[in-house]
Amino acid sequence: MAQDCITIKGTRGGLLILLDASRDFNEIKANLAAKFAAARGFFRGAAFALVPTSPLNSQETAELEAICREHGLVPGNNITLPSRRRPGGNQAAHPDPVALTSTGLPTLLDEGNLRNGQEINYPGHVMWLGDVHQGATIRAGGNILIMGTLKGNAHAGSQGDRSAAIVAYRMEPEQLGIAGIIARSPEQKTRHPYPEIARLVGTRIVIDPYLSPKSSRN
């Protein structure tokens, strides 16, 4: 499968949208629009800057900026890529948060595959672009959005927020937690070929298809 031509990175100032300008421009546009559509408004309100691997002409830049604006992003200034490291130990490094105006908490945006023994702890929302493998854990004070497969552990609302939710493209977790309520995956896991959302209903964690931001709580 061809490598993604778009990479989105979070910084203190906003989102850096890294573009592989060697790819077909129509492919770049389609990939960018697909990423925003899949995020379902998660980026809305964030500042952005385009970072192509080689210069774009003014028409190409305008078309890509238009796609970003259509999904609620706003052009930003002085957005720079933070220095990053991912140590071999258990704690995975993360960049500075992206503040989204549509939420009361900052958002951590990062990408990659979280491996067995690695753990992300963050007081705000976490958006992970990649898979979370068995034995890996994400803990967030707010919501967790995994744009990949969740096979490890995800704990949202870690400071007691009962309205927090966990969304994954493929929901196959070892363990889910929301506001201290824990649910463990059954031995016979049912795999569904669509995104799902886990929320707290009473004292139970309920998983529904993620059809829209207003998908049923029942």
From Swiss-Prot:
GO terms for biological process: cell morphogenesis; division septum assembly; regulation of cell division; regulation of cell septum assembly. It comes from the Bacteria. Keywords: Cell cycle, Cell division, Septation. The keyword tRNA-binding does not apply. Gene3D superfamilies: 2.160.20.70, 3.30.160.540. The keyword Cell cycle applies. InterPro entries: CAP/MinC_C, MinC, MinC_C_sf, MinC_N, Septum_form_inhib_MinC_C. It holds the Pfam family MinC_C. Cell division inhibitor that blocks the formation of polar Z ring septums. Rapidly oscillates between the poles of the cell to destabilize FtsZ filaments that have formed before they mature into polar Z rings. Prevents FtsZ polymerization. Interacts with MinD and FtsZ. Belongs to the MinC family. NCBIfam families: minC. This is Probable septum site-determining protein MinC. It comes from Moorella thermoacetica (strain ATCC 39073 / JCM 9320).
